[in-house]
Each structure stands twice: as C-alpha cells, then as structure tokens.
Amino acid sequence: MFRLQLISAFFILLFSLSPVSANFDYFQLVLTWPASFCYPKNKCQRRSNNFTIHGLWPEKKRFRLEFCTGDKYKRFLEEDNIINVLERHWIQMRFDETYANTKQPLWEHEYNRHGICCKNLYDQKAYFLLAMRLKDKLDLLTTLRTHGITPGTKHTFGEIQKAIKTVTSNNDPDLKCVENIKGVMELNEIGICYTPAADRFDRCRHSNTCDETSSTKILFRG
C-alpha cells in the first residue's frame, strides 16, 4: 500500500509541473515488440509478452534531438520505488535483472541521448514517469488483436497503421521495421507521438523503415 501511495505521489508531482516553453515540436514514445527485438532468442536475458518502452524522444518536425547539453543520468537507488515500476514498463531485456537494476544501462543511454533534450520541461524522474504514464494509457497489443493483427501473422503497412490510428485520434504512428531474416520484413517498434505537454496525440514523422506498398506483408512475429 505504501509503495502505491509513493507511486501516486510521483504522478501527482508530474501533473503539477508548471508549463514552460518547449524547445522541441513533439514527443515520440517508442514501444518495442520483444519477439522481434530478441530474435534470435539468445539475444535477450529477459523478455516480455507485450510491448515495452524503448524510449521517449523529443523531436523537431524535420529531425531528432540527441545528446543535448545538461546534467547526465544519475542512477536511481535500489530503495527508490521507481525502479520496480520501470522494471514493468521499461524492461532492459538484454541484461539480467541484477545487472540491469544496478547499472541501469538502457535507462542511462536513453536519458543521456534523448531525455536531457526536454529537461526544461521534465527533470530526470519526471521524464521517466511521463513515459510510463503515456504507455499506461495504451494497450497496443489488444488494439492490434482487435483488428485481427495477432502475433505470428502478416499484414500490410496500411492495415497495421489503420489499426493503431484508432487509438491515436487518427494521427499517424511511426511503424519501424527490421529484416531479421533476409527478405522478411517484420514489425519491430511502434512510435506514438504527442505534443510537448503530452496532453494530445500528434502526427509522427515516418522513419521509412517499412515497405508501405500494399503488396508487401509485414510479419508481426510470434
């Protein structure tokens, strides 16, 4: 109960942040599909059966902001309850739990590369809480399944995009694909975009890693 109260207090603090002008145009919340990311299976020490956070990226309309000036990542302490919450939403799949929670390599990388670029709006803890809050509002796996897109099946770019747009107020997501097997395009990540205040969805700039033609089927790896 005490842990839940602490987490609730974190979110109350996040919502009470004073508005400040942003130096970026929108956020992209990037969610990774573990079955694709972890292929072949020995690539990951741990994995999830649902989408997990890759990062929350402040972006300009024409380019991504990276490695901005500011204080570098400070590791969260073991007794800090945010680690337990991050472990559920932002899994460091390439590392075992002990190493991941102690060294925090993915969280450090993402904050130093992207999070610092929105420091005028969100400090380190607020940045991570924001990413988790945004993910909590989405259930992309259920959304895809509702539209017949289930793990192990293939669909066109348009079919996947149309399904995701039903939960983004019709704003384009950024579908990100890889070829783990030559000639087989598969869905690796989904980017969902928001205004700097994270109060509304926004349109994502396409990264153009997927074949968007109607003749190509994209694998949603099972």
From Swiss-Prot:
One of its GO terms (molecular function) is ribonuclease T2 activity. This is Ribonuclease S-3. Keywords: Disulfide bond, Endonuclease, Glycoprotein, Hydrolase, Lyase, Nuclease, Secreted, Signal. It catalyses: a ribonucleotidyl-ribonucleotide-RNA + H2O = a 3'-end 3'-phospho-ribonucleotide-RNA + a 5'-end dephospho-ribonucleoside-RNA + H(+). Self-incompatibility (SI) is the inherited ability of a flowering plant to prevent self-fertilization by discriminating between self and non-self pollen during pollination. In many species, self-incompatibility is controlled by the single, multiallelic locus S. Belongs to the RNase T2 family. RNA binds at H54, Q92, M93, H109, E110, R113, H114. Gene3D superfamilies: Ribonuclease T2-like. It is found in: Secreted, Extracellular space. The lineage of its organism: Eukaryota, Viridiplantae, Streptophyta, Embryophyta, Tracheophyta. PANTHER family: RIBONUCLEASE S-2, RIBONUCLEASE T2. InterPro entries: Ribonuclease_T2_eukaryotic, RNase_T2-like, RNase_T2-like_sf, RNase_T2_His_AS_1, RNase_T2_His_AS_2. GO terms for cellular component: extracellular region. Glycans are attached at N50. Residues 1-22 form the signal peptide. Disulfide bonds join C38-C44, C68-C117, C177-C210, C193-C204. The gene is S3. CDD domains: RNase_T2_euk (cd01061). The active site is at H54, E110, H114.
